[in-house]
């Protein structure tokens, strides 16, 4: 047993080891399994394996069971499993991983490396492929890079060697091979590495390698090596190759090659040799792989290497070498010197390294001279064209490749329309531009100063501007400007003080620029630099002087300045337009409640009223004439009479209606349609309760009876007759008691109306007309609830309502004065407005505004009164119109007046220029309308009384008027009598009830109804 027990622990160890091996094997197979932790632990005697075999407890010892004195003693730190576990746990905390995890990570990394090496075709040929341990052990980027370098070194080196042999001279080949080896190692490592590394890593590695190689090769290749690194990296670049060969090879090479060539181009553009080299390289490069446009675009752009196509990422990164710095410096700071210095340094490096520099330099100028014209032509024009496309920014005219004036600091923005200094082509271009720019010379209107002085000032100004704008320009530009710049600056300062001379300066500057271009190339260059400055100067002057001439100075510049001037002019014009707009906007007020001008609205409201009334009465003029004088006097008297009548007979609305109808009938005795009229009047009265319907019915019925207008009047008069024939006459007499005594008053009224039969007829006509007009207006107004009229006729209706109120008050007074025609006339004037108010009152009766109904009754009485009353009524109408004109109508909300049916905004005349009585009546109308609404039960009782007495249709309109009268009793007896008179008048003139209803609408929107009624009366009176 002891032996077994002793053997078992080794078995456990072996099993643990085997398990670990299995784990690793499993990992090798692809399964990821962490090695068993107990593999490293010391064997535990008490493992389940020990208990696998049957134990004979009689013979089993404690050791076999794992119980030993050692088990009770702490094992050494290295031996105890618990301690090891704790250590592992502790080490694992915050640590990269436990031994198991580290082992797993390493194994996985190895497996991945092996797979990558197998997959990558380049790695297959690499010598390191035979030793996967290299890949397995590769833990750092450098190791990987070295592995790839070793793998691709031979291939890349061979390729580069062949390229070098093809393009380089014999003595240069060895140097080329060295350079290519250096570059090739990095390039091959990086080029082969891309399979594993990302493009960014490749670029970075290329940059590193290219930077290292460039330090050696920059001088030799003159920045061309970087291009060759991407393709046949060092070989084609090396100075041994002629520029023609180099350019052809570069053309064959990727665009990246041209990218770095663009750097030398930017550098060489300043020097003729450099320009020639760049042109040659660009020419061939464009013909081969990259177009000169892209090349020039690269030159123009600060991040030329970044701008290059993705095929040349290495070259892009290679650019950050001193060459790239040179290009950036060219863009940022003076640069011609920098480029020359950088080139010189490269040449010196070539001298030292290969001694091939002289040949390269000689080759460069030769090739450049040969291809100068072709390359410059092909390169420059498409170059700046493509530059425009690529940059998508055009500073005025097309920019030549010299747009970036190397003499100027890179951060100096190009002047719009201006081009940087160029020695050859740009001078011609600048001369052309200068010649073109002076085209607006005839425009220089401000010749306030002498031209000579202006010319003198202009040249220094231009130079000074150039100097000031570009203080960092090359010494050439400064020397060209020379002392002239200082003198020009002084002159400019002198001239700057007078703003008037500035305009002349611009024109003179143009002339001077042309002359300068003719004088010398240096002057042309200065002027070329100056055009932008001049543009700026012109802009400044234009801004300061704001003269139109400044827009003329130069084409592009002048156009821009003109645009600015035009814009300013437009702004000024816009201001005027805005002012007009303000005025226009003032016409339609922004407020949702437009305040209608009284006079203009009154006139349009008249035709609208006529239109409304025309349907009911054909003879508008006739009815208007009768109606105008008749209604005011009658209304006044009747208003007086009706209030008293209604007060005495208060609730006998039927009697009141009878009296009104009797009065109307008496007034309409001359009319033969009395029989027809009763029904019509009854219909009208009923319709007056239902204002729109009553109006339409009464008017429609009245029209067939005696012509559209006259039948209406006749109908209203006959209604009065019928009322008088029936117990209504008695009621009318009772109401007439206000004038005298019951029936006598009625007779007096009849007589009063008959005082002048013609006038009475006119009054009847007018009453009828007013009734028809009121019916119409009621129909049209009541249907929209006087909203239409409130808007257009609100002012007139308000005034009419005021007048109707005052007239109703007068009528309340005039029942006693009814005997006197003069008082009736005075009342007529008011009653005219009262007639309107009557129509409104009828409408208000519907709406709960009963005051207008009483005014209607007064209008009926007016119709019964003499022709003098008609005259007075016409006068009153005129006065009402005048009052309306003088009055300012304002819409006010009836929110506080809960009794008014018409809720919302109502037209009210604030000044109420009408008589105090009218003003009171108006206020009473509006105020009483609410009171009338509160009095509606009384009205209902009166209407109920009148209904049994009157025919139901007649009683209905009477009820509509009667409630108005009843309600008017509480707020004011005048109001009641007014409503009663309107009830009688509703019988007499259901059309007047329409008017009254309109006026009642005016109670809510009194102004609109009153305005409509007044307009109708005026139109009728005029007709």
From Swiss-Prot:
Keywords attached to this entry: Cell cycle, Cell division, Isopeptide bond, Mitosis, Nucleus, Phosphoprotein, Ubl conjugation
GO BP terms in the entry: cell division; chromosome segregation; regulation of mitotic nuclear division
Main location: nucleus
Disordered as annotated region, ranges: 1-21, 542-580, 667-729, 803-860, 936-1023
Biased composition (Basic and acidic residues): 1-14, 696-706, 803-816, 1013-1023
Molecular function per GO: protein phosphatase regulator activity
UniProt feature, compositional bias: Polar residues: 979-992, 1000-1010
Protein name: Cell division cycle-associated protein 2
Organism (species): Homo sapiens (Human)
């Amino acid at each position: 047993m002891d032996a077994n027990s002793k053997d078992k622990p080794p078995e456990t160890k072996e099993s643990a080891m085997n398990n670990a091996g299995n784990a690793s094997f499993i990992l090798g197979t692809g399964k990821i399994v962490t090695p068993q932790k107990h593999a490293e632990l010391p064997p535990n005697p008490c493992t389940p394996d020990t208990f696998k075999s049957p134990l004979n407890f009689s013979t089993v010892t404690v050791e076999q069971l794992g119980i030993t004195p050692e088990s009770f003693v702490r094992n050494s730190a290295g031996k105890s499993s618990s301690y090891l576990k704790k250590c592992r746990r502790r080490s694992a905390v915050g640590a990269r991983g436990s031994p198991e995890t580290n082992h797993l990570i390493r194994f996985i990394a190895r497996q991945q490396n092996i797979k990558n090496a197998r997959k990558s075709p380049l790695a297959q040929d690499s010598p390191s492929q035979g030793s996967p341990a290299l890949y397995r052990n590769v833990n750092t980027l450098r190791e990987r890079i070295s592995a790839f370098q070793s793998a691709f070194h031979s291939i890349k080196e061979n390729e580069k060697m062949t390229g070098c042999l093809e393009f380089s001279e014999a003595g240069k080949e060895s140097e080329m091979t060295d350079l290519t080896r250096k570059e090739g190692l990095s390039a091959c490592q990086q080029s082969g590495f891309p399979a594993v590394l990302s493009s960014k890593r490749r670029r970075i590695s290329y940059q590193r390698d290219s930077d290292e190689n460039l330090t050696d090769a920059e001088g030799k290749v003159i920045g061309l090596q970087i291009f060759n690194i991407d393709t046949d990296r060092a070989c084609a670049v090396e100075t041994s190759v002629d520029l023609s060969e180099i350019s052809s090879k570069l053309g064959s090479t990727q665009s990246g090659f041209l990218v770095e060539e663009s750097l030398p181009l930017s550098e060489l553009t300043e020097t003729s040799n450099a320009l020639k080299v760049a042109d040659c390289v660009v020419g061939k490069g464009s013909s081969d792989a990259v177009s000169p446009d892209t090349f020039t675009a690269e030159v123009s752009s600060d991040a030329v290497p970044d701008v290059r196509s993705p095929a040349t990422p290495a070259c892009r990164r290679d650019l950050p070498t001193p060459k790239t710095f040179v290009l950036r410096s060219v863009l940022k700071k003076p640069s011609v010197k920098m480029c020359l210095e950088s080139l010189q340094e490269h040449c010196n490096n070539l001298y030292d390294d290969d001694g091939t520099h002289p040949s390269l330099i000689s080759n460069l100028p030769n090739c450049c001279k040969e291809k100068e014209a072709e390359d410059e032509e092909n390169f420059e024009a498409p170059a700046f064209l493509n530059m425009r496309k690529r940059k998508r920014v055009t500073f005025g005219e097309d920019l030549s490749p010299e747009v970036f004036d190397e003499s100027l600091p890179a951060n100096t923005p190009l002047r719009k329309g201006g081009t940087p200094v160029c020695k050859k082509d740009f001078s011609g271009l600048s001369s052309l531009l200068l010649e073109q720019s002076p085209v607006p010379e005839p425009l220089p209107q401000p010749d306030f100063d002498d031209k000579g002085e202006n010319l003198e000032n202009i040249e220094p100004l231009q130079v000074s501007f150039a100097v000031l704008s570009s203080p960092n320009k090359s010494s050439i530009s400064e020397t060209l400007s020379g002392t002239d710049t200082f003198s020009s600056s002084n002159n400019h300062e002198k001239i700057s003080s007078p703003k008037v001379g500035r305009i002349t300066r611009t024109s003179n500057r143009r002339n001077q620029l042309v002359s300068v271009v003719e004088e010398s190339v240096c002057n042309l260059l200065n002027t070329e630099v100056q055009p932008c400055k001049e543009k700026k100067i012109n802009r400044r002057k234009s801004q300061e002087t704001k003269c139109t001439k400044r827009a003329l100075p130069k084409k592009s510049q002048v156009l821009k300045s003109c645009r600015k001037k035009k814009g300013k002019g437009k702004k000024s014009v816009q201001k005027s337009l805005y002012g007009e707009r303000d005025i226009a906007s003032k016409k339609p007020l922004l407020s949702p409640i437009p305040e209608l001008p009284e006079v203009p609205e009154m006139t349009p409201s008249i035709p609208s009223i006529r239109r409304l009334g025309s349907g009911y009465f054909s003879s508008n003029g006739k009815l208007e004439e009768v109606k105008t004088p008749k209604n005011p006097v009658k209304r006044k008297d009747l208003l007086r009479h009706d209030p008293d009548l209604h007060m005495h007979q208060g609730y006998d609305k039927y009697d009141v209606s009878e009296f009104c109808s009797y009065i109307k009938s008496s007034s309409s005795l001359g009319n033969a349609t009395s029989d027809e009229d009763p029904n019509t009047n009854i219909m009208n009265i009923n319709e007056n309760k239902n204002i729109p319907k009553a109006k339409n019915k009464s008017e429609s019925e009245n029209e067939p009876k005696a012509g559209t207008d006259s039948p209406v009047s006749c109908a209203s008069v006959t209604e009065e007759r019928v009322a008088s024939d029936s117990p209504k006459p008695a009621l009318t007499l009772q109401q007439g008691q206000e004038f005298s005594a019951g029936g006598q008053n009625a007779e007096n009224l009849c007589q009063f109306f008959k005082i002048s039969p013609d006038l009475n007829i006119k009054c009847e006509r007018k009453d009828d007309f007013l009734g028809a007009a009121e019916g119409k207006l009621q129909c049209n107004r009541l249907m929209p609830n006087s909203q239409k009229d409130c808007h257009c006729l609100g002012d007139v209706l308000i005034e009419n309502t005021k007048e109707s109120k005052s007239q109703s008050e007068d009528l309340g007074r005039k029942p006693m004065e009814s005997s006197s025609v003069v008082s009736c006339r005075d009342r007529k004037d008011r009653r005219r407005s009262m007639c309107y108010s009557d129509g409104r009152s009828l409408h208000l009766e519907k709406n709960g505004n009963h005051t207008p109904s009483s005014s209607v009754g007064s209008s009926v009485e007016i119709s019964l009164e003499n022709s003098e009353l008609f005259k007075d009524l016409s006068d009153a109408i005129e006065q009402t119109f005048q009052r309306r004109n003088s009055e300012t109508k304002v819409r006010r909300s009836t929110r506080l007046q809960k009794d008014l049916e018409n809720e919302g905004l109502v037209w009210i005349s604030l000044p109420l220029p009408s008589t105090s009585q009218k003003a009171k009546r108006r206020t009473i109308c509006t105020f009483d309308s609410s009171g009338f609404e509160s009095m509606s039960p009384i009205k209902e009782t009166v209407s109920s009384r009148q209904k049994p007495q009157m025919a139901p249709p007649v009683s209905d309109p009477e009820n509509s008027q009667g409630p108005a009268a009843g309600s008017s009793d509480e707020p004011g007896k005048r109001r009641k009598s007014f409503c009663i008179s309107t009830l009688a008048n509703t019988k007499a003139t259901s059309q007047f009830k329409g008017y009254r209803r309109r006026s009642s609408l005016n109670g809510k929107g009194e102004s609109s109804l009153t305005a409509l009624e007044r307009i109708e009366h005026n139109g009728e009176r005029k007709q």
